[in-house]
Amino acid sequence: MMMWQRYARGAPRSLTSLSFGKASRISTVKPVLRSRMPVHQRLQTLSGLATRNTIHRSTQIRSFHISWTRLNENRPNKEGEGKNNGNKDNNSNKEDGKDKRNEFGSLSEYFRSKEFANTMFLTIGFTIIFTLLTPSSNNSGDDSNRVLTFQDFKTKYLEKGLVSKIYVVNKFLVEAELVNTKQVVSFTIGSVDIFEEQMDQIQDLLNIPPRDRIPIKYIERSSPFTFLFPFLPTIILLGGLYFITRKINSSPPNANGGGGGGLGGMFNVGKSRAKLFNKETDIKISFKNVAGCDEAKQEIMEFVHFLKNPGKYTKLGAKIPRGAILSGPPGTGKTLLAKATAGEANVPFLSVSGSEFVEMFVGVGASRVRDLFTQARSMAPSIIFIDEIDAIGKERGKGGALGGANDEREATLNQLLVEMDGFTTSDQVVVLAGTNRPDVLDNALMRPGRFDRHIQIDSPDVNGRQQIYLVHLKRLNLDPLLTDDMNNLSGKLATLTPGFTGADIANACNEAALIAARHNDPYITIHHFEQAIERVIAGLEKKTRVLSKEEKRSVAYHEAGHAVCGWFLKYADPLLKVSIIPRGQGALGYAQYLPPDQYLISEEQFRHRMIMALGGRVSEELHFPSVTSGAHDDFKKVTQMANAMVTSLGMSPKIGYLSFDQNDGNFKVNKPFSNKTARTIDLEVKSIVDDAHRACTELLTKNLDKVDLVAKELLRKEAITREDMIRLLGPRPFKERNEAFEKYLDPKSNTEPPEAPAATN
């Protein structure tokens, strides 16, 4: 910084040579620009001055460049003097000097660049035009060809009889032609009528007879630039549009092969914005990084193998599938599979989002689809991946434009259908797509010949979660005690996270690393993983949210009711932890259960889950004179389960084997059943919930002392684990149905459980 300041202080002497003349030259040009002489005379004068000053100005610029370059080269590097004791110091001094030379060299190159010349040209041009069109004040010098005052005109010329003719130009400028010399003097007036009266008065005082008085002629004279004024807004607008277009079109393309920055070109809105990936790009993800979805990975790998070695399949008469659609819940790895395909394939891979086809301009979506497939065919064999295809692939005729108006989304979908399976279809272009909602896609898009394979990627089971954990644990700095048995660690974490997707697992691993760093721990331990899992499931601990004693006691008995019900119900999920620490958005307490990976739920399981959900409210009813609003989420879950049992699962004798599911995603104005049936459904739902409430009340009434024990322990510790529950209540009277839980979390389960209290349904 000091070096730059020292050089900058030495520069002004050279920089002054950039001016276009000293004070004497400025005083020569300025009166010419501001004078009221005829325009052609001003232009001739300016032309002469420009001719005389051109050589001088170019010489000054060249001398500035030479002096500035010498200053850069000869200026000593103060930081590098006297530091020759080591190679490291010498190298750093050389690099500093090189950086300074590059910095000043770029400055001198800028002054010689075309951009600087254009800027100076525009500045000088606008200055000249503004000066020519702007009235100016009086100037010193000879009276000819300059602006006078009316008093000067009267005393110097009119009273002496030196004026032969007077011209009133444009009703505000008076030009007086002198006798014999043909010179012209001028002055401005405010009103023509007042000027004529003043002329008559002066000539009356001079006793000039009417026949000898000076004739006054009125003329209209336009400036060479006056005709531009009506077109000036249009010129500025077109010039601005041209400048913006040049800037946008000249922006460099993306590194991944996409369009340029900004709008991607004002006249290129119909171009595809797909990004190109190949083996030269920075995509480092391969199929080794994908775990937990082996079947889907095998399906996608076949596309890559076919493009790499088509002869293996063609000799058997097989053809490559035209496309595959990946569907499943968010976070299950659909986009990750596409990235792995881009990293493994030796063919061009074009990636685009479905929303990039949707624009405000009509026809842009279809144009981009055509351009995308044209680009893919030019690089065939190639792969196209369209993420979130439901943005353009929704079923036609639903949710479209009203009144039969043109729907841009449908036009885009029609073009996509034609490109995938039409007259110009290429067998060498494979289309992959991802969506979270395959149920809303158009049937024509999902048929064989377009998307031949429908690959469903569900949330991973315990084995899939274990494989995903093994992938993510490799990059973490774990406690040496944990690295000795990675299979056991990954299995335990997989058991602790039922229902987690690949994205949830990656988030939990990252949260564990962040928690360890927050506590300045050198390694990540199992305690950090447990805290991270709780953070992902229940939210952040709200330690600053202080509850009153009554609120805390109410929350403790509420959670104790849930825990005791779950402990003594056969089909309840294994309890892992109960806490009354506020978490997340409004949650004052929570209980963590570990449900097994199951795909069928019996009627008895539904009823036991409803009993456990009502345990919090029933515990409040048994221990407090008034209940609280803490059970509103429990009621919501109970109502949903009871309603599903009656309307869609056939678990109600009065409704029978009928389905009235209202959650099919389609809006219906009229219900598919009568009012009488609706009343019957309401009564059946209420009956199931009442039965669950009655059974829960009987169960907790028989175990009031156990509820008190758990609640007091919660008030003392704020969080209790499964070991605390065993210490307080004894082992569960039922064998756990979760095999992974017994293997990784409860290896010493009791083989002879005690008799369980009865729970009527």
From Swiss-Prot:
Effect of M360K: Slightly decreased ATPase activity, highly impaired maturation of CCP1
Mitochondrial matrix membrane side: 1-115, 245-761
Cofactor: binding details: Binds 1 zinc ion per subunit.
Family classification: In the N-terminal section; belongs to the AAA ATPase family.
Assembly notes: Component of the 850 kDa m-AAA protease complex, a heterohexamer composed of YTA12/RCA1 and YTA10/AFG3. Associates with the prohibitin complex, composed of PHB1 and PHB2, inhibiting the activity of the m-AAA protease complex.
Primary localization class, coarse: mitochondrion
Disulfide bonds: none
Result of altering R447 to G/K: Suppressor mutation; able to complement a mutation in the Walker B motif of YTA12
Enzyme class, broadest EC rank: hydrolase
UniProt keyword annotations, A-Z: ATP-binding, Hydrolase, Membrane, Metal-binding, Metalloprotease, Mitochondrion, Mitochondrion inner membrane, Nucleotide-binding, Protease, Transmembrane, Transmembrane helix, Zinc
Cofactor: Zn(2+)
GO MF annotation terms: ATP binding; ATP hydrolysis activity; ATP-dependent peptidase activity; membrane protein dislocase activity; metalloendopeptidase activity; metallopeptidase activity; zinc ion binding
Protein name: Mitochondrial inner membrane m-AAA protease component YTA10
Cited Gene3D superfamilies: 1.10.8.60, 3.40.1690.20, P-loop containing nucleotide triphosphate hydrolases, Peptidase M41
Species of the source: Saccharomyces cerevisiae (strain ATCC 204508 / S288c)
Comp. bias (Basic and acidic residues): 72-82, 91-101
UniProt subcellular location: Mitochondrion inner membrane
Annotated region (Disordered), positions in chain: 67-101
Reactions this protein catalyses: ATP + H2O = ADP + phosphate + H(+)
Entry membrane topology: Multi-pass membrane protein
Entry's EC annotation: 3.4.24.-, 3.6.-.-
